Each structure stands twice: as structure tokens, then as C-alpha cells.
């Protein structure tokens, strides 16, 4: 059951400071290990901090892909020239996914809500918005919180998106979050969770899991949970997603792995080349895929 059964929040319950909304218990949230980890990671996340220091003549300012690349996966299937009223992004980071959707897919919206637990990443999203002006006609609302309760009315969001996020969220919180998504998304709305779940059957993850059991005190606090396709479907069904989005797909990513490419930060020789060479048969894709995406259908 979602926490919203007992508590209902709105943005009026948050404090707006320098373009970011903060919950009333932000000082308490700042003391959690999970937030401290992501604030630290956010400072240098995938080199995105370079947007804050590059000169006016830098090619990065002319070509966003030099900063972020082009996210693939389900985003390749996203329709062109779609327009919606409201977009909610869970784990927005510095805005990589909406930047791509705005520039390459011409997705348009009137309101964009971005939620992330990392304040440094939200501050960087503001800078990315200034530099590239994605969703040029939209109101922007950035919210620094853990997203256990979404501060929106029932049936108020047209499109919920997320990119490579849910493997970082503890399982009970993820289940609550999916119930919240089912609450706030409009009937007939859309969701796209690209590469958002790690695959529990992937050989690479199985090796990592074995190593973590050997040294449990030094487990990576970032990657918290893995799922099978059927478990993901069960989470979505139990959350009530089908009452709003009757049809959806859970599909394996096209990134496959039989070997970890790093262990405890140490590169494994030839692992990347071996993983990139994999071309599994259809029957093996769900086993060898690094993760899963889930999205409502049709994407139109």
C-alpha cells in the first residue's frame, strides 16, 4: 500500500530555494546514508560537471551529445512530435533523458516535474536547462526528495519517465513509489522506465552477488535490488498501474553480460569485449540481458 493512503503532499508543503523545492524534513533526509551517497556521486556524475566550467566557444555548448551522449533503449521507440501537458521524471539527474527527448524527438510539454534525491544533480539540471533550453515552453519544477510520496494530485500526470533509476531504490520504497505512480498518472497516460531494473538472472550480476556475500560489510550501497521480468510485472500489477495503463511491456535490454567488467573498481581484462560480442538467441535474451525496461503501450 502506498504511504499516500495516510499522507497527501503537494508542492505547497515544500520550500522553494534557488529553483529547487525541498521537503520540510530535508535536514533529516540529509543525514541518511542513501542521500549522502548520491550527493557525493552527483558532484561528478558521468563527467556531467564539465558543463559548469566550459567556455562559451566550447563545442559542448553547441552539441548536447558531447555532454551526455544519446540514451538508447526504449527512447529509440519513443514517438516524434508528441505533446503532453505534464511530464514527471523520477530520478531526473542532470536531465539527460528529457534533454534527448526534447531535442531529438521534439517532445513538448507545458509542465516538467523532475524529482531526484541528489541536490548537486538538480543544480546541474538547472545549468543544463539554461545552456540547451530543452522543453522551451514548459514550466520547470525540480524537487529534491526521496520520492516515497509524490506531491501531486490523483490523475494529474500525463507521462511518467525514468532512466536507469529503480535498481538504486530499496525494494519497499520502489513498491510504494509504483503505487504512487499509479495514483498520480492520468487514465490512459503513459510511462517509460528505460533500463530501470537490473536482471537477477544475468550471469554478470550473479558473479557480483557472490562476491558481495563474501564481503558483506563492503557491499555497494548504490545497486540495491535485481528482478526477473515476472517480478517486475507483479510489482506493476500490484501497484495498480493497469487501472490507468491497461497495456504495458517488460522487455530485456539489448545490453548483455556474462562477465562483470569491474570487480571492486578493478577492470576485468577482456570482459567488455566479450560482453559486447554477445548475440544471444531470442530464448536467451531474458537471461543474459543486463536489465529490463518497462513501458506502457502503445507508445503514441
Which residues does each predicted region cover?
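Acceptor-substrate binding/catalytic loop of class I
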Residues: 215-231
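Conserved alpha-helix/loop element of class I SAM-dependent methyltransferases that forms part
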Residues: 60-83, 100
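Class I SAM-dependent methyltransferase SAM/SAH-binding core
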Residues: 94-149
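A short glycine-rich, Lys/Arg-flanked "PGG" loop and its adjoining helix->strand segment in the class I
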Residues: 175-187
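Conserved class I S-adenosyl-L-methionine
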Residues: 192-213
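A conserved beta-strand element that flanks and buttresses the S-adenosyl-L-methionine
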Residues: 161
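N-terminal, positively charged/glycine-rich alpha-helical extensions of SAM-dependent methyltransferases
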Residues: 2-54
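A C-terminal cap/extension of S-adenosyl-L-methionine-dependent methyltransferases
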Residues: 3-5, 192, 211, 247-300
Amino acid at each position: 500500500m502506498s504511504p499516500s493512503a495516510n499522507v497527501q503532499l503537494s508542492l505547497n508543503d515544500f520550500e522553494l530555494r534557488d529553483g529547487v523545492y525541498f521537503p520540510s524534513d530535508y535536514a533529516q533526509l540529509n543525514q541518511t546514508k542513501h542521500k549522502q551517497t548520491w550527493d557525493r556521486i552527483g558532484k561528478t556524475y558521468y563527467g556531467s560537471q564539465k558543463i559548469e566550467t566550459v567556455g562559451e566557444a566550447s563545442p559542448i555548448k553547441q552539441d548536447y551529445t558531447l555532454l551526455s551522449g544519446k540514451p538508447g533503449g526504449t527512447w529509440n521507440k519513443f514517438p516524434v512530435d508528441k505533446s503532453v501537458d505534464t511530464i514527471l521524471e523520477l530520478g531526473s539527474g542532470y536531465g539527460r533523458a528529457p534533454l534527448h527527448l526534447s531535442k531529438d524527438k521534439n517532445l513538448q510539454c507545458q509542465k516538467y516535474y523532475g524529482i531526484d534525491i541528489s541536490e548537486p544533480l538538480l543544480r546541474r539540471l538547472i545549468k543544463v536547462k539554461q545552456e540547451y533550453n530543452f522543453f522551451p515552453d514548459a514550466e520547470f519544477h525540480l524537487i529534491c526528495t526521496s520520492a516515497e510520496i509524490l506531491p501531486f494530485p490523483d490523475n494529474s500526470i500525463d507521462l511518467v519517465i525514468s532512466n536507469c533509476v529503480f535498481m538504486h531504490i530499496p525494494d519497499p520504497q520502489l513498491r510504494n513509489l509504483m503505487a504512487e505512480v499509479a495514483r498520480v498518472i492520468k487514465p490512459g497516460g503513459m510511462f517509460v522506465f528505460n533500463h530501470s531494473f537490473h536482471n537477477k538472472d544475468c550471469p554478470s550480476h550473479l558473479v557480483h552477488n557472490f562476491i558481495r556475500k563474501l564481503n558483506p560489510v563492503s557491499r555497494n550501497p548504490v545497486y540495491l535490488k535485481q528482478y526477473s521480468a515476472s517480478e517486475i510485472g507483479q510489482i506493476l500489477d500490484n501497484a495498480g498501474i493497469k487501472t490507468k495503463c491497461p497495456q504495458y511491456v517488460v522487455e530485456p535490454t539489448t545490453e548483455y553480460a556474462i562477465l562483470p567488467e569491474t570487480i571492486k573498481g578493478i577492470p576485468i581484462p577482456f570482459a567488455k569485449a566479450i560482453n559486447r560480442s554477445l548475440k544471444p538467441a531470442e530464448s536467451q535474451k531474458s537471461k543474459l540481458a543486463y536489465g529490463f525496461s518497462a513501458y506502457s503501450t502503445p507508445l503514441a
